[in-house]
């Protein structure tokens, strides 16, 4: 190393300072993961060099044998990790080691809770592995030179993790990056060959290039020259996905997942598959155990790592899976694609369409298997990713039935409010003669559970699915049936229970409707433009009145979403239904004063709107009418 020039001291980005604080104060009980993170980064740097060297072979000059070396110095209390990958320029070093250049950083920092386990997961999925060096080191030095630049353009970065870092230009003979960790007091155990070897075997055996350590040597006899330093490869150094499934242990699959997903937890499930024939490719797909913080940002980077004939081509290749599977991590290695493939080409290539279709089915099969064989694990999956899976029927018509089978709902079968009922379970419990799947959407579980719309269903013992996620009404607009049974929104249109109503019931309903024609006309006149129709209800057993949605009208949930986003909402008026057996309706029918009849009608209308979760257009008028009624009753 020559003399340092252009030396400057810079401050870390605020978010990095916060992260370093968490690292330095030992966020992790499992400190040895620092080595896994640094090796993972070095592996990525070598992958990038391999890819760039396809079009610029001269980048490999001075060392075509790509590898990672880990060494230590017990006396100096240091651990050094070196790769001969792509390397970094001065600008790269300042950008990558001084800031987090990622969208969603502010959201990420907000999500840090102070709970060590949760925070370690978040930091892992955010991909800030380099900073984990500060778990064991009180000073970190980085020496780097980008491939293709002269030796005089090396860079030296140094920091104690206390808010600032130094960066200087130095001579560096070889391309690539060397990281020197100056271990904290009490962390000397890591300056040991046996310890480092075990950590590499445990966490990084799957890395597809050699990781070398100095060979253990017997001490030189007195007067003898110490033996020349020899290196030995301590990992398997083959791409894990290229090995037969029978030869890969679960622990290896789990560690490989942590490498590709930058996660600190084991995956929930995985699927490893080799396809031969017309198309030839290998896929290794993982479902994480927990949702990333940016799951609901549909434009956030996503996708699989793409390799072509085991050469890394790109991260986050999003063309292989639909958007509703953006939580899936993993690798796809194709023999049919060109090495100079671009994102634009991926979007148009018919080979990709075939692979996407097959990989989508593979993920759905993996989820079906998980739901069937490990329902508790699937419950965890649903809690984390259920709302994203609900985007599926709109995006993926071909797999609509398969996706519908994976959906889970709360229902009137219990009071837990837990989304645990599958459509298959619902149909297995259906009443004899029931040929429909009944559901109700609303803003909250408490609101839908107590909705008057459910009264007739409770009376007849018919289960109703309770849908309260913001996406649910939109979802149901894309689901027309499941297993040949149509979906029916119990708050929409004229409720027809089909075979579940006896002929006597139907006849009685017709007679009551005829008998109440006079009341219907009076209510129409009183409510005027507020309603599209007034009719006798077949839904109610306990409540006096209810508002139903017109068959073609937009539901309340969807209306509220559009209004909140400032979009124009089509005009629609509810249907006012009343329960002729309710004492209040009897009193209303007998009311002689049309003014009082009008006030009572509007009170019933507003109460029905509130019960449906809607807000009143004129709350002051409702309060005025109610107060007037209370005064009359108290006289």
UniProtKB/Swiss-Prot annotation:
PROSITE patterns: HSP90 (PS00298). Residues 1-343 are annotated as: A. Pfam families: HATPase_c_3, HSP90. It is found in: Cytoplasm. InterPro entries: HATPase_C_sf, Heat_shock_protein_90_CS, HSP90_C, Hsp90_fam, Hsp90_N, Ribosomal_Su5_D2-typ_SF. Keywords: ATP-binding, Chaperone, Cytoplasm, Nucleotide-binding, Stress response. One of its GO terms (cellular component) is cytoplasm. NCBIfam families: PRK05218.1 (NF003555). This is Chaperone protein HtpG. It comes from Pseudomonas syringae pv. syringae (strain B728a).
